[in-house]
């Protein structure tokens, strides 16, 4: 049986987990947006020490006498140095917060890409096993049909073979739907139109790793909350 729904294999390009993460960090729109915000906040720091622009007002007419004359008013507001210093400190802290937001988005993006990548790989391997079982039950069904025709078996054996193969076909169809959804999510995270799929043999079971206090305190979320 051929299950419908899976993308054409010849249109897919294999990619490693690390390459997928690197691509996402460069292309992802949410991360790009956070970086632009951080760059904008960095530019604003310079404005904290800028003096207000000088205002010049010119007037012409009978101002001080019956004769026509001119009058110019020059206005310049200058605050105490501490005002500019405080403004710059506030802008600098806002920039630091925006940089932590960038780091936070990057950490979350890496997590999402890794999850989708390895789930994608797991389902691909599951599909391979189901296809192998489909072939086995296909042979079993052919033999059951032949045995039924020559009277060597009853209808139960034939029906059982048909049911088993039908269940596998249903599982394959559902699995292909899941693969299509993961493919779309993968493309969205990496922000690419290329049909990228996990490289064959790049699957690894996740394992629990020791978590030390230092690594926890360096997490962007913790740093952002500590500000």
Name these PLM-found stretches.
Residues 30-36, 49, 79-109, 131, ...:
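Sec/SRP-type N-terminal targeting helices
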Residues 2-10:
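C-terminal segment of classical bacterial N-terminal signal peptides
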